[in-house]
């Protein structure tokens, strides 16, 4: 699969890097890169599961990024102006230092003045916590300061959380709990301002739902969740852990009713050719042009990504990439242009078969336009020390649909740097 890298031309300006690039399907595409923070943990610990968000745009147009820092604290930085400008990003606001380092935080706004961060760690290793965050603003709506509340433990023996905002202003979170030799389970919880944390399917229950349970394969499941904005159905898709012999995806969905959601029957072999491990976790995005959920996964032993369009009835259509011109693909996430319906697939080109947990590489992207994928990747960052990608997702009332934007971590040791990227027309 080894292929030569594309030619690129790079210009440096103080604190901001503007990269002008050429690719076979993109003519003079450009990206702006700016450093947001310099105290991050390495990417596999600092950034969330790909289906969640660490970079958000609030209802007032302000950008906020959430990450785990090198000391294990939860950290928040924000930009009240253009996030691509020098000096746009604030100094980090930090949580109190936990007993066990926080990892893989997923952030959700619950109002212009509040957000919640779901993360691993806190009181003990293996805990999953809900950290409330207060957002102070000036009269112009600019963020003035961030303050952290006290964390609440949602679960123990938990990992790989995915959290989303829902149409009713609430939150739904999923996570995995794997018991060696016994089972691997994906659970779910729902939060609303009125009820706090309850079952997704029963607002009177404080017991999490069992979304997926596999008693034949007790390896990790890295699952992500999304809500359809048309019928409010929830979809959960996940891949297997790195030590699994299975190359299957797992799936479940929940229909929305008067009192909440009702989970359907799980599918432990939704696809049968998926790569394993965190760096190949599935990604979920909404395509408003076609009214489909788009599930992205790395096809095992290839340089291709499986791209599945899932309609409201649950039917799926594959629009997979061709073999991409890279050595090895990791950390794939997909964004949809809500105006054109074009797909932008961000991935990292890493050395062949990197050790588990060492999937560092070049940041790249390719595009599906007018129904056709380009096999040639456009280079964003040629450093081989990058790990993890978190995309900006459009959310109801919170913007995020004007440009394709991501953040990623740069550095093989902590402290690492977090970079913000905007693709420009």
Task: Name each model feature, range by range.
Residues 1-7:
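N-terminal secretory signal peptides that target proteins for export/translocation
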Residues 12-24:
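Bacterial N-terminal signal peptides
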Residues 29-425:
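Extracellular, repeat-based ectodomains that mediate carbohydrate processing or recognition
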């Amino acid at each position: 699969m080894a292929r030569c890298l594309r030619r690129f031309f790079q210009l440096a300006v103080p604190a901001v890097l503007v990269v002008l690039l050429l690719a076979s399907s993109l003519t003079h595409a450009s990206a702006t890169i700016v450093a947001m923070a310099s105290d991050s943990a390495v990417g596999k610990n600092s950034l969330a599961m790909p289906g969640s968000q660490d970079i958000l745009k609030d209802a007032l147009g302000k950008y906020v990024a959430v990450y785990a820092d090198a000391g294990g604290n939860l950290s928040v930085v924000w930009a009240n102006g253009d996030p691509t400008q020098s000096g746009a990003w604030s100094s980090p606001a930090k949580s109190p230092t936990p007993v066990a380092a926080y990892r893989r935080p997923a952030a959700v706004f619950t109002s212009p003045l509040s957000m919640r961060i779901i993360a691993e760690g806190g009181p003990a290793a293996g805990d999953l916590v809900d950290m409330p965050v207060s957002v102070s603003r000036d009269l112009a709506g600019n963020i003035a300061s961030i303050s952290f509340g006290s964390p609440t433990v949602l679960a123990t023996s938990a990992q790989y959380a995915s959290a989303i905002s829902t149409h009713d202003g609430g939150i739904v979170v999923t996570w995995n709990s794997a018991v060696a030799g016994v089972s691997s389970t994906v659970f779910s919880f729902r939060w609303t301002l009125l009820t706090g944390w309850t079952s997704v399917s029963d607002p009177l229950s404080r017991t999490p739902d069992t979304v997926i349970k596999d008693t034949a394969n007790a390896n990790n499941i890295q699952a992500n969740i999304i809500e359809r904005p048309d019928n409010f159905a929830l979809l959960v898709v996940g891949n297997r852990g790195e030590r699994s012999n299975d190359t299957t995806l797992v799936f479940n969905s929940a229909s929305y009713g008067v009192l909440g959601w009702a989970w359907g029957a799980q599918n432990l072999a939704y696809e049968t050719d998926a790569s394993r491990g965190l760096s190949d976790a599935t990604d979920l995005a909404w395509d408003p042009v076609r009214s489909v959920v788009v599930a992205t996964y790395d096809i095992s032993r290839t340089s291709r990504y499986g791209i599945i369009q899932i309609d409201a009835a649950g039917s799926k259509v594959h629009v997979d990439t061709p073999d991409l011109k890279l050595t090895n693909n990791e950390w794939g996430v997909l964004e949809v242009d809500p105006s054109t319906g074009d797909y932008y697939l961000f991935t990292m080109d890493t050395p062949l078969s990197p050790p588990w947990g060492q999937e560092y590489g070049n940041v790249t992207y390719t595009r599906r336009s007018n129904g056709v994928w380009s096999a040639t990747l456009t280079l964003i960052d040629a450093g081989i020390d990058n790990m993890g990608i978190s995309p900006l997702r459009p959310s109801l009332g919170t913007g995020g649909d004007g440009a394709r934007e991501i953040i990623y971590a740069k550095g093989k040791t902590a402290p690492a740097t977090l970079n913000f990227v905007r693709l420009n027309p």
